[in-house]
Amino acid sequence: MNVLLKRRSLTFAPRWLWCKCRSSRSRPYSLAHAVDTSKMEATRRNGQIVKDLGRYYPSMSESALHDLCQEYKEVTIADFNERFLGNPATLHHEDNPNLLLSINGRIKSIRFSGQKIVFIDLYNGSSGLKNDTQLQLIVNYNKIGGSSEDKANFSEYMNFLKKGDYIKALGYPGFSQSRVKMLSLICNKLPIVLSVSQLPLPSRLNDETKIKSNRVVDYQLNGTQTLLVRARIIKLLRKFLDDRNFVEVETPILSSKSNGAMAKPFITSSKDFDHLELRIAPELWLKRLIISGLQKVYEIGKVFRNEGIDSTHNAEFSTLEFYETYMSMDDIVTRTEDLFKFLITNLQKFFQDTRLPVPKTFSELHLALSENNWKFRKVEFLPTLNKELGIDLMNSGLDINKPSELLKALPKDIAKKYFPSADNTGQLSSLQILNKLSDVFLEQRHCQSTLPTVIYHQPAILSPLAKTDPQNKQVTKRFEVFIKGKEYINAYEEENCPQLQLQKFLQQKQINELTGNKTETLSPVIDYQYVETMKYGMPPVGGFGLGIDRLCMLFCDKKRIEEVLPFGCVDDVNRQ
């Protein structure tokens, strides 16, 4: 039994290979035949694989596999390259047959030099390590140990291996005999098949539709650089907050209420509950934890909004929210500037260490911030809007919460152009009017630069969870960060008075009822339990929300959100 297993683990070659090799009528394999990837050959190969699946998909726990590799020290491609590639003097361009190594990886390419020497480029995906690229294997008939039968079937066995197969290579470090003297693993045993590929990869994949429909093939052909950068960004976000003694928590995703942001929720049910909603933001749960006694909390996770999908929006997306006690709006702005400096400087080092290409927008952002001493540009909401419109929205006699007064204060040409249905003010809220004015006259005109721009002191009607400015009751201690016209961050001093919070919730509900447009306001159910919880005492607290997917788009220089999601948007996911 052990002998049989050992032969299987050593060869893992199809039986038809052994039979054909014994035949005196077998013709020598030409180079063209050795690398043939025709459908006929793939079909024949797959037929043999299907007949003996255990042989071509062995368990890594198989005893024969361990017995065979006892003399060999298992290392990764990165370990091998770091030890020998970075220090060629270690080997002095000489083979070292006394150092036996075992390396697992995937075949990237196979090249035959006659019938007795095979060159294999082995790689192991991409872990983001500088030396974790690939390694050349040299499989030379004259240096392969084992039985005479193994050596007799060398050509047949090596021709069975194809691009995409996973193998275990056994050998010692050395160099090719060419003038280049390329560092290689000189195999002294035939490579062991760990898993085979049954579908050949296309030579390239550039069509966007096909990329969206098969991300697995896309990553194999075009690389996983975006995934690596995204993973590093999330790791750095955690490190920044962990280093400042924030506590990471997980709050409910499924509950009977999804309050916390202006969005339409996904509604579902379960065996035990008739009405459940997916969260649209973790905000109110995180603030409950602040009330419970935690000083600094954060959560990185998914939120869900039942709204449209476009280049910057998906139905599910990742956010970071953190809350810190005793923080003013200016303190949160400073914290945000520090966060961007930390992210960008550490990502710059990551790009250097991994030799990944530095995206253009990342370089531009790095330059813009470093030249401005890592400070953001600031634009105040109402004063800037006044200047753009040539009016005074801060007039003490004007109530911007009333749509009729707000529309009347606008220049006639502006009102006619952007609010043609102005006469029917019952269907148009101040929230909608101010959002439109902000989009046209603030975001489009003042937030298009690479240098991050802060719009601050948003009107109270736009900010139901934010603290009111003590100097001007019509605005709040809130700010948003824009880069090249897109919003990335929303932050503010949190309302901590239960009575005022309830008033703001009721005001939002009233707007809901007047406009009949629930997609632009809070979920219609007021969270009275949250208001009641506030009465136990809520300290002054600053809150911060960041869209991680958009940040990844910015740092990776991607135009669409699906490009930074592992499997794209919902419609892409449904096709895979």
Swiss-Prot record:
Catalytic activity: tRNA(Lys) + L-lysine + ATP = L-lysyl-tRNA(Lys) + AMP + diphosphate
Protein's job: Catalyzes the attachment of lysine to tRNA(Lys) in the mitochondrion.
Top EC class, one word: ligase
Molecular function, one GO term: lysine-tRNA ligase activity
Localisation per UniProt entry: Mitochondrion matrix
Organelle targeting peptide span: 1-30
Pfam entry (one): tRNA-synt_2
TM helices/strands, residue ranges: none
Originating organism: Saccharomyces cerevisiae (strain ATCC 204508 / S288c) (Baker's yeast)
A single GO BP: lysyl-tRNA aminoacylation
PROSITE patterns xref list: AA_TRNA_LIGASE_II (PS50862)
Domain of life: Eukaryota
Alphabetical UniProt keywords: Aminoacyl-tRNA synthetase, ATP-binding, Ligase, Mitochondrion, Nucleotide-binding, Protein biosynthesis, Transit peptide
Keyword hit for Nucleotide-binding: yes
Enzyme Commission (EC) number: 6.1.1.6
Annotated family: Belongs to the class-II aminoacyl-tRNA synthetase family.
Matches recorded under PANTHER family: LYSINE--TRNA LIGASE, MITOCHONDRIAL, LYSYL-TRNA SYNTHETASE
Name of the featured protein: Lysine--tRNA ligase, mitochondrial
Misc. comment: Present with 2280 molecules/cell in log phase SD medium.
